[in-house]
Amino acid sequence: MTILLLGDLTGRSRVALRMLTYELEARGHEVLALPTALISNTLNLGQAAMLDTTDYLMRSLETWEKLGLTYDALYIGFVTGVAQAEKLCEIAEAAKKRGI
């Protein structure tokens, strides 16, 4: 099964995309992963630098579609805000229409 992961990529600690990718690949799944945000460290430390990657994520998904890359399951994790949430909802709705 190929799983598309959309979530934050954190520079410190094995959390979010780093953890999910590791666990799912260890269980034999193929993983396609794109960050919703790049975050310097876990948020529990009190402060973090963050880069919203919505534009990159959308361009990457368009590229993958042109290349014929497909997925069987979708995971959406960390969302940076309302604008990104709206786009991620569109992705989820399109996946649902395809039976995912």
Segments the model singles out, each with a brief description of its role:
Residues T2-R14, R18-I100:
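Ribokinase/PfkB-type carbohydrate-kinase core domain
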